[in-house]
Amino acid sequence: MKITLSKRIDLLAFLLPCALALSTTVHAETNKLVIESGDSAQSRQHAAMEKEQWNDTGNLRQKVNKRTEKEWDKADAAFDNRDKCEQSANINAYWEPNTLRCLDRRTGRVITP
């Protein structure tokens, strides 16, 4: 079956408007804008849940902060004690880095510089 050029053009002329009509219905645009105040029941519930979780973890955060501060104070005190031990007039005093104490070379006992 031979299709002539004019039949092809006629077929194209028929199919082109059909294709355009289908493509415009498929690609319909919406120009609707929804504005929410952000004060919905769901957002209030979500905020309440976040606040409850924050309060529940507050005790844990406080413990972590206290532990960190305590460790920092311990390191700071050890640094000060090391300086005092090294500057001590006692020639038998030496700083033990593993135990973070000032010891007497002869007896191995803790001394206060």
Swiss-Prot record:
UniProt keywords, alphabetically: Signal
InterPro entries assigned to the protein according to its UniProt record, in alphabetical order: DUF1283
Name recorded for this polypeptide: UPF0482 protein YnfB
UniProt family annotation: Belongs to the UPF0482 family.
Pfam families linked to this entry: DUF1283
Signal peptide residues on this chain, from the entry's feature table: 1-28
